[in-house]
Swiss-Prot record:
Protein name: Spore development regulator umv1
Role of this protein: Component of the velB-VosA heterodimeric complex that plays a dual role in activating genes associated with spore maturation and repressing certain development-associated genes. The complex binds DNA through the DNA-binding domain of vosA that recognizes an 11-nucleotide consensus sequence 5'-CTGGCCGCGGC-3' consisting of two motifs in the promoters of key developmental regulatory genes. Required for gall induction and teliospore formation on seedlings.
Composition bias type Basic residues, residue spans: 271-285
PROSITE patterns: VELVET
Complexes and interactors: Forms a heterodimeric complex with velB; the formation of the VEL2-VOS1 complex is light-dependent.
Length: 814
């Protein structure tokens, strides 16, 4: 192979020969003697040994063995995971006078470096032509010369790193798919002329960006090549020590960089340097890898704020803290625990929701470093924590305890209360006797979230509570006003009566305002009941907080079980009317109760004139009676016993012996309400006066009732079985009705079995007229059927016999 003479290694060419070349404007002078306008460059010829190559000894030493690596993956998920530490190989070239025998071109990693000979030992100069002269050294193969100026500046040396099996030394190039390499990154390195840690000039091959895709145990085969002309000569190969490639979960972490790597980084080589070992923490989703490098190295990277770990800022402490507040600001009394803490000053419910969701409790104690407090205050807390007047209203509950956690930020309705005292100078209130020590924090959060997270116009926004003190006695019970909120009990107000119930309901979540007058406050219609007798226990008028209290300024929706006539039975019972004024033809007076329902569909003018129909008068009187029979509750054993002797087991029509036992009629009945007594008119205010006058927004608006059903016309009980009863029902539907009674209740108001609302609700004259019409229609049916038996006639006469003869004709209207 022919090469230029300047590139040959013949002895005829002097070792120090150099060719001086200048630009076009210069002369053949040295750079120091050139003119000012000329720039001279000196080119040194690269000398290679094309002959006597069997006299050259290549020594390869692995200065940094690879120990571990993290697999980088395949495809789009692949990333850079370099081998730790980066493999570094040192090269030394020694020439000998005689050819050396290298049976195996692949050497081991541990080769004894050449030793310099003392002066006078061995040959002073190589005797073989073409052998480089230099510093005399001694190696395992004999005496030789090492010319560093020759091979350290040779750019034709390079090294290739390939992956091999750790046990079989099998070379691994491609994966099973046949197109993906085992390694990723740069697997080729040129020769770097660098200083060693002792300051000597040496040649190194460095692989700082070599990654492996698959987990396993491998070796690196490092092959040295030299390019000569248009060909490449393989010089020598070396194997590294075995190392393991881990998965992301099993990777132990990056180790601290060695002194050699740090020295190379200081000289400008692109090597990642870690000053401290990066060990993987348990439970961490991120692995400590080479991406977090030092800022002092050339490959240092700024860590992204999004990828910053809490361990870089927070101290490693195991003290649990729910909120980052100092110990001096912890709540010191039971009442202070339910106030908003002084670091929480945001009244907006939306912001409190996001703060709670986005800021979980910290695991570190905030008093260990001041930087933690600054970070926490800049993230979520209001810096105006020194304002003494920022006091929040707290909502206490009877079952709160001392060892509860701090409530969440959105446990109140976010309103300020004007307070003239700092939150930490108050005296601790005495614990209430009604507090339950077993109540958990979940009950409190459920109570306050469902009750107080609304704008209630009844509760004052700026009402400042009385300041509590240990020396002051508890406040006396108010005479005309009862605290409308359960939180006032914890501030010194006495508890209400024993019938006090929680102000929480799934139907009406707000708190009703109690009546200040001694007269009982009219209540809303009864709620929807699941049993027919559940309304008996709800007639108590001594309750202050109603479970089904009305929501202020909200129109109540229509309910199928609601009857407008229930409003008459909610008030107090007036004195019994005179016997002579029970006639429907007597003079009418305004009613004593102010109606909150809509006008009757049949006669709208009755409510403006103060008129009440006979059905409403009897219904109201019967519902206020303490006797079950007067309220229309039949006795099932007596009602269904002896059907053969009583053809009307469920419709007694006022006869004591027909459908109910006589014992229920021996007790005195409650006097009906005097619906015709003069009244002063509706009260002026909502809570003032005797009656109850709701605003127009609270009037119950009911939809129009459908057409009455034949099965429920003029009464609410179920139709008895039997042919006679069905015929009697048809005759009852055909009879004329009083128009004052309005529309009869429809099928939606059918009461359950055993409940008879018509018992005692009609006037005596109305019942007599009903009996008369029923008897006439029964006679017509009997004539059409034929003669009846004497027993049937006797039973029918006894059951339908009125108490006194009727004073009206057969077809006489009202």
């Amino acid at each position: 192979m022919s090469r230029p003479e300047s590139r040959s290694g013949n002895a005829s060419t002097p070792q120090g020969t150099s060719v001086l070349k200048a630009d076009d404007g210069g002369s053949g002078q040295t750079p120091g003697g050139s003119t000012e306008n000329s720039v001279a460059y000196r080119y040194v010829a690269v000398q290679q040994m094309t002959s006597c190559r069997d006299h050259i000894e290549y020594q390869l030493t692995v200065r940094e063995q690879p120990k571990q690596s993290r697999m980088c993956g395949v495809g789009e998920k692949a990333d850079r995971r370099p081998i730790d530490p980066a493999p570094i190989v040192q090269l030394r070239v020694v020439t000998h006078d005689r050819p050396i025998r290298q049976s195996d071109p692949v050497g081991s990693a541990s080769v004894a470096p050449p030793v310099e000979r003392r002066p006078g030992q061995g040959a002073a100069a190589p005797q073989t032509p073409g052998v480089r002269r230099g510093l005399p050294v001694t190696t395992a193969l004999g005496d030789g010369w090492e010319d560093k100026a020759w091979y350290l500046e040779n750019p034709y040396y390079f090294m290739y790193a390939m992956l091999c099996n750790a046990d079989t030394d099998e070379e691994l190039h491609l994966l099973n798919d046949g197109k993906t390499r085992y390694t990723s990154g740069s697997c080729v390195s040129c020769l770097y002329h660098l200083k060693d840690i002792d300051g000597s000039h040496q040649g190194f091959f460095v692989f700082p960006d070599l990654s492996i895709r698959v987990e396993g145990r491998y070796r690196l085969k490092l092959c040295l090549f030299e390019t000569i002309g248009h060909s490449v000569h393989h010089c020598k190969s070396i194997y590294s020590d075995p190392f393991h490639v881990y998965t992301a979960k099993r990777f132990p972490g990056m180790e601290e960089s060695t002194r050699l790597s740090k020295s190379f980084a200081e000289q400008g080589l692109k090597v990642r340097v870690r000053k401290h070992p990066r060990s993987r923490r348990r439970g961490s989703k991120r692995t400590k890898d080479e991406s977090d490098a030092s800022d002092e190295t050339p490959l240092a990277r700024h860590v992204s704020p999004k990828r910053a770990r809490a361990s870089d800022v927070l101290p490693m402490s195991g003290l649990p803290m729910s909120q980052p507040i100092a110990s001096s600001r912890m709540p010191r009394s039971m009442d202070d625990r339910f106030e908003r803490a002084d670091y929480d000053r945001t009244p907006s419910m939306a912001s409190a929701y996001y703060d709670v969701k986005g800021a979980p409790p910290s695991r570190h104690a905030p008093w260990e470093e001041e930087e933690v407090l600054r970070l926490r205050e800049s993230r979520a807390w209001d810096p105006m924590y020194d304002a003494p007047s920022a006091l929040y209203s707290h909502h206490a509950r009877e079952d709160r305890v001392e060892d509860r956690r701090l409530p969440p930020r959105d446990f109140a309705d976010g309103r300020y209360m004007d307070g003239d005292y700092p939150p930490h100078t108050r005296s601790a209130a005495a614990p209430l006797s009604s507090m339950s020590a077993r109540a958990g924090p979940s009950e409190y959060s459920e109570h306050v979230r469902s009750v107080y997270l609304r704008d209630d116009p009844v509760r004052s926004m700026h009402g400042s509570p009385h300041r509590l003190s240990a020396a002051l006695p508890p406040l006396p019970p108010p005479l005309s006003k009862t605290p409308s909120h359960p939180a006032l009990v914890g501030r010194g107000y006495p508890e209400s009566s024993a019938s006090l119930t929680p102000a929480y309901s799934r139907n009406y979540p707000s708190v009703p305002a109690p009546a200040p007058a001694p007269a009982p406050m009219p209540m809303r219609p009864a709620p929807l009941l699941s049993r027919s007798y559940d309304h008996i226990g709800q007639q108590s008028s001594g309750r202050i907080y109603d479970d089904y209290g009305p929501r202020p300024n909200v129109v109540a929706h229509y309910s199928g079980s609601y009857d407008p006539r229930d409003a008459l039975a909610r008030g107090f019972s007036p004195p019994s009317p005179q016997p002579g004024r029970r006639s429907p033809y007597a003079s009418h007076h305004p009613p004593t109760q102010w109606r909150s329902g809509p006008p009757s569909p049949s006669r709208p003018s009755d409510y403006h004139l103060g008129r009440a129909s006979a059905v409403e008068r009897g219904y109201a009187a019967a519902r206020r009676s303490p006797i079950p029979s007067a309220r229309g509750i039949d006795t099932p054993p007596e009602a269904y016993a002896g059907f053969e002797s009583n053809p009307f087991p469920r419709r007694s029509f006022g006869v004591p012996d027909a459908g109910r036992p006589a014992a229920t009629y021996d007790a005195p009945r409650a006097p009906p309400a005097d619906l015709y007594a003069p009244d002063e008119g509706p009260p002026s205010g909502r809570l003032g006066g005797i009656g109850f006058a709701p605003s127009s927004r609270e009037r119950l608006i009911l939809p129009p009732l459908p057409v009455p059903s034949p099965l429920s016309a003029h009464r609410g009980e179920l139709t008895p079985l039997g042919t006679r009863d069905r015929d009697r029902e048809a005759a009852y539907i055909a009879m004329p009705r009083d128009r004052d009674q309005g529309l009869a209740p429809t099928e939606r108001y059918l009461s359950p079995s055993g409940y008879n609302p018509r018992a005692g609700e009609l006037d005596q004259r109305d019942r007599e007229w009903e009996w008369e019409c029923e008897r006439e229609r029964e006679r017509e049916r009997e004539r059409k059927r034929g003669p009846a038996s004497p027993e049937y006639r006797r039973d029918f006469a006894q059951a339908t016999m009125p108490s006194k003869p009727s004073s009206r004709g057969h077809n006489q209207p009202y």
